[in-house]
Curated annotation (Swiss-Prot):
Subcellular location: Cytoplasm
One CC-aspect GO term: cytoplasm
UniProt name for this protein: Elongation factor G
Organism: Variovorax paradoxus (strain S110)
UniProt KW keywords: Cytoplasm, Elongation factor, GTP-binding, Nucleotide-binding, Protein biosynthesis
UniProt gene name: fusA
Cited function: Catalyzes the GTP-dependent ribosomal translocation step during translation elongation. During this step, the ribosome changes from the pre-translocational (PRE) to the post-translocational (POST) state as the newly formed A-site-bound peptidyl-tRNA and P-site-bound deacylated tRNA move to the P and E sites, respectively. Catalyzes the coordinated movement of the two tRNA molecules, the mRNA and conformational changes in the ribosome.
Entry keyword Protein biosynthesis: yes
Length: 699
């Protein structure tokens, strides 16, 4: 089966927006227009199409599907058919991980801004992540019909806040309730959409009151295009006009290189401008073949690349897992190279496992289509994969490659959860397992002692949302404990002789174990080490493993506050035994007593997790942010200027002081600062803090 659409006519894009900028309406309108134009040859009344639009709104497919495929021939129907895959990017960036995972598989992004609110904090965060993955983008200023809409003010905000380089390619005709259409600065024509949901439109002359502003921005557009090459620049400087073709080609080249961002406008709600934005996606966004080959490593860890080509060996990245009520688990994949056919076996190098693809489905706006194969550049969902988690590679078993992994941080905060009823018990286990598969930054374990289920994640909000999803998606009601920090204990002093005795001899078979241990602190991160230094058989060989077992058990509960003990070296160097009464149990108990006895004398201390915190903030708030971090026992380690303005402040702060930080930071910076936090290392807690921790545990 050959390709239906050549890969050069593919566009894999994300539509990214602050919560209120109108992303859903924009996406729905895209699906509506592409749906209509795809079926343009069929005779049907508008009602049928609109029906599915209403139904879409009820079913919310645009919102739930991680990737939707649609087709576009241009608003005048003059393009060859292009295939546009829209990857959903979350509107809420409390989970930067979600945005990162979509940015990782996109080739280009449409940034939607509200014509009134402009560039909001959330937009800044998404912009930084797009910078990190070098994603080409264009800007669509939506809601031009709102009171207070101001297109050129949003342009200025993009320059000031994002340090973007927007190139205006459309000027709005009117604004607020007078918004009628746009002027296309490449064609220098006005475009007015009809009232039939914007399906038809007419070209006209530029309104007289806009001539000056259109000429000014047309000049800037041509200048931006001329900078694409020396040849064009010379032509421009010699006063030659650049053709429409030359301008488009140059703007495309510079957009894909990340040097400029074409800027458009419209009102999705009023059916104006979305069609021209789709044209811009086709004209200025990259095809999979326009971006560099993807990097990975082979089985010997040697670097390899995979080109976007059907003839290469198959490689893909699983970027999202979803549970579908009809087909079970869907694994959304982006194919980077080669072809995948239904029934093929794929290899997952991260887990070292082969799995078979049951079915492959592609989501279209109003239906899902089963397909037999997917090729380089495609995005689809696979059914039948059981072992894959987000961010893992799938590849041809005969040509193993591991694509660059998304990095998921270690969890640092935990909470106990317990089901409210017996009926919730079983469902909770299934729910937590599913959620952990979908989100690699979330972990589940069972507390040995209390038997409680402990969930661990990246922060308070993360765990709140997990508990909320258990209730919404799996119907599990759970009670949640208070967030807990994972403290540790260690020792600071060497104790030469720590004696442990376990003796029970009162008639009949007794118990007798006796050990003398030496305890020494190890350097941080070295872990636990056990040394057998018994001479002359004072402790028989067969009991030595029991002594080590006892010490390991004692390590699980420190003497200060019962936290696990780390970085200790224990040497067994003396002891005694009884021919009849000694046994493994007795020596294990003796070792536990000996270790606890020694630990008390060895200057025990509490260790707390230290977090590397990085705050990105507009300059005005930098002083307050630094002061606040210091008040949280933070060590500010440096402040850098950010590409794109603002300051990046790096600090090391104890995790226990970071609870509630997102709320404080939000109010301190009016929502404009963002922060990331990841575990760095354990450090000794100051005495007053340690005393408070011990007192809290003693309650």
């Amino acid at each position: 089966m050959s390709r239906k659409t050549p890969i050069e006519r593919y566009r894999n894009i994300g539509i990214s927006a602050h919560i209120d900028a109108g992303k859903t309406t924009t996406t729905e309108r895209i699906l509506f227009y592409t749906g209509v134009n795809h079926k343009i040859g069929e005779v049907h009344d508008g009602a049928a199409t609109m029906d599915w639009m209403e139904q879409e709104q009820e079913r919310g497919i645009t919102i739930t599907s991680a990737a939707t495929t649609c087709f576009w021939k241009g608003m005048a129907g003059k393009f060859e058919e292009h295939r546009i895959n829209i990857i959903d990017t979350p509107g809420h960036v409390d989970f930067t991980i979600e945005v990162e995972r979509s940015m990782r598989v996109l080739d280009g992004a449409v940034m939607v801004y509200d014509a009134v609110g402009g560039v909001q904090p959330q937009s800044e965060t998404v912009w930084r992540q797009a910078n990190k993955y070098k994603v080409p983008r264009l800007a669509f200023v939506n809601k031009m019909d709102r009171t207070g809409a101001d297109f050129l003010r949003v342009r200025q905000m993009m320059v000031d806040r994002l340090k973007a380089n927007p190139v205006v390619i459309q000027i709005p005709i009117g604004a607020e309730e007078h918004f009628q259409g746009i002027v296309d600065l490449v064609k220098m024509k006005a475009i007015i959409w009809d009232e039939d949901k914007g399906v038809t439109f007419t070209y006209g002359e530029i309104p007289a009151n806009l001539t000056d502003v259109c000429n000014e921005y047309r000049e800037k557009l041509v200048e931006a295009a001329a900078e694409a090459s020396e040849e064009l620049m010379n032509k421009y400087l010699e006063g030659g006009e650049l053709s429409e073709e030359e301008i488009k080609k140059a703007i495309r080249q510079r957009t894909i290189a990340g040097e400029i961002q074409p800027m458009l406008c419209g009102s999705a709600f009023k059916n104006k401008g979305v069609q021209a934005m789709l044209d811009a996606v086709v004209e200025y966004m990259p095809a999979p073949t326009d971006i560099p080959p993807v990097n990975g490593t082979d089985e010997d860890e040697a670097p390899v690349t995979r080109k976007a080509d059907d003839n290469e060996k198959f490689s893909a990245l699983a970027f999202k897992l979803m549970t579908d009520p009809f087909v079970g688990q869907l694994t959304f994949v982006r194919v980077y190279s080669g072809v995948l056919t239904k029934g093929d076996s794929v290899y997952n190098p991260v887990r070292g496992k082969k799995e078979r693809i049951g079915r492959i489905v592609q989501m279209h706006a109003n239906n899902r289509e089963e397909v037999n194969e997917i090729r380089a550049g495609d995005i689809a969902a696979c059914v039948g994969l059981k072992e894959v988690t987000t961010g893992e590679t799938l590849c041809d078993p005969a040509a193993v490659v591991t694509l660059e992994r998304m990095v998921f941080p270690e969890s640092v905060i935990s909470q106990a959860v317990e089901p409210k009823t017996k009926a919730d018990q079983e469902k909770m286990g299934i729910a937590l397992q599913r959620l952990a598969q979908e989100d690699p930054s979330f972990r589940v374990k069972t507390d040995e002692e209390s038997g409680q289920t402990i969930i661990a994640g990246m922060g308070e909000l993360h765990l709140e949302i997990i508990v909320d999803r258990m209730k919404r998606e799996f119907g599990v009601e759970a009670n949640v404990g208070k967030p807990q920090v994972a403290y540790r204990e260690t020792i600071r002093k060497t104790v030469e002789e720590a004696e442990g005795k376990f003796v029970r001899q009162s008639g009949g078979k007794g118990q007798y174990g006796h050990v003398v241990l030496k305890l020494e602190p190890q350097e941080a991160g070295k872990g636990f080490e056990f040394v057998d230094a018994i001479k002359g058989g004072v402790v028989p060989r067969e009991y030595i493993p029991a002594v080590e077992k006892g010490v390991v058990e004692a390590l699980t509960q420190g003497v200060l506050a019962g936290y696990p003990v780390v970085d200790v070296k224990v040497t067994l160097h003396f002891g005694s035994y009884h021919d009849v009464d000694s046994n493994e149990m007795a020596f294990k108990m003796a070792a536990i007593f000996g270790f606890k006895e020694g630990a008390r004398k060895a200057n025990p201390v509490i260790l707390e997790p230290m977090m590397a915190v990085e705050v990105e903030t507009p300059e005005d708030y930098a002083g307050n942010v630094m002061g606040d971090l210091s008040s949280r026992r933070g060590m500010v380690q440096g402040m850098d200027d950010m590409i794109g303005g603002g300051k990046s402040i790096k600090a090391e702060v104890p995790l226990s002081e970071m609870f509630g930080y997102s709320t404080t930071l939000r109010s301190m910076s009016q929502g404009r600062a963002t922060y990331t936090m990841e575990f760095k290392h354990y450090a000794e807690a100051p005495r007053n803090v340690a005393e408070a921790i011990v007192a809290a545990r003693a309650k």
